[in-house]
Amino acid sequence: IYSLPFKENYFDLILCNHVLEHIEDDNKALNELHRVIKNKGILIAQIPLDKNLKKTFENKEIINRRDRNKYFGQYDHVRIYGLDFYKRLSNSGFKPKKVDFLKKISTKEKIKYCLPKDEEIPVGIAIK
């Protein structure tokens, strides 16, 4: 994800579904996604977002599975995103938007598909 084999301005849409919380340098990855997306292209960046955190929690010294599970909620995560994720999108050249798709889904569907009650999906519109 740091060096994708595509030319600049290649994609109209990129779906990055639960990837960024697993990689060491998410800013480098976002910059690379911006490179390969067209102007006004859409990046859907689904991540675990804790709306109670103003700032993303990450600590490079937390390296073993037990501690990562304890602090990040999963052994292979390297951070928990806070509300500053939208600023990270902006810093990489995207115009950030929040999409609350759950308002459009019935309670029955939320239960059927085990969806969280208040998930927000960050979307970035590429600005070039």
Task: Indicate residue ranges for each PLM-predicted region.
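A short acidic, Gly/Pro-enriched loop at the edge of an enzyme's catalytic core
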Residues: 2-14
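S-adenosyl-L-methionine-dependent methyltransferase catalytic module, highlighting the catalytic core
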Residues: 24-38, 42-127
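A short SAM/SAH-binding and catalytic strip from SAM-dependent methyltransferases
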Residues: 12-24
